[in-house]
Amino acid sequence: MKKQLLVLVLALALVACMFTACGGNEGQTEPETPAMTDEEAAAAVDELIAAIQVQERTEETDAQCLAAKEAWDALTDAQKELVEEGDYFALDTGDASLDDPLNQDEIGENELLVVSFGTSFNDSRVADIGGVEKALQEAYPDWSVRRAFTAQIIINHIQARDGEFIDNMDQALQRAVDNGVKNIVIQPTHLMHGAEYDELVSQAEAYKDQFESMIISEPLLGEVGSDATVINADKEAVAKAAVAEAVKAAGADSLDALKADGTAIVFMGHGTSHTANVTYSQMQAQMQALGYDNVFIGTVEGKPESTALPEVKKAVEAAGYTKVILRPLMVVAGDHANNDMAADEEGTWYYGFVNGGEFEVEGADEAVDIGAGLGAENVSCQI
């Protein structure tokens, strides 16, 4: 609490300093407060940003988000360059006004709550998460579709930067209760049955007694299991749809045509230390079972180890492919797809494949065409 109060004080001091030049009015005898240096002003904004890069929402969150934005706006261009987390406000991720947060009241008796981890990339949020929400609303016109994000840190980012308010799970469920919703279906856009899905279920079940019925749907890839060779129908459907979209986006006639051209498709997922990481091995087994020999599954986190970039690169090279198409195995092509996969800098998957000279990566002369997430491709709505 003391730190939160300090952050708010810093914000007020910074904004006041910028607008008054830290001087008193003419005729006043109070001593002038020394003006902040550019470095101090930038550091104060970094402190304000750090205060809202948290997973817990508190009574101070709204004020903290507003204070951070006001402090940022009060900086000069030169001062903004000194803010270590400057991209928090400065990075252009698209037009937030095109996104519908779906936080309206007047829900009715039946609600379909679409729960996503979330993304602060505006274009990805509109295309991927919004794509799923709109498809579900079209499929179930008698139900009111609403949104919730599980990542408070992302909710705060969007609120501070764009002034867009998105409900977290508790807010969305309480909104449903307050609106007299009787039947609620919770549809996660999470890819797999991991730690985040477990937490989602736990939060939802705390409200279960306040509805006549509550159904919590499975994530996109369905049940996990423990055997990497045992694959459910959901994974088969996702594999077929995702590969078909990748082939279409590449402008190829078929996956076999890409194979004949020496091209592999590499899907990059997130990865997890949760026991559900066997899902990625199951997806690789599914690709092989379908005869998709030139399709490989990797993860940012390299968990399981067989999905780490060096291992995937070895597998692609050993299979004799010299060209690679990178695609996100994620419902949302947000931060990971843009920064960990497609960015042309050391440590990314693009760089990892291109740097050694063994491979050509789609878009290597410019920027990698990372493709949309599975949400925008409506893969999730085909399952």
Segments (PLM) and residue ranges:
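Acidic, proline-/serine-/threonine-rich low-complexity intrinsically disordered repeat tracts
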Residues: 27-35
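Short, glycine-/Ser/Thr-/acidic-enriched flexible segments
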Residues: 3, 72, 331
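Bacterial signal peptide processing site
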Residues: 23-25
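Extended amphipathic ligand-handling, pore-lining, and cofactor/metal-binding catalytic surfaces
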Residues: 89-325, 330-383
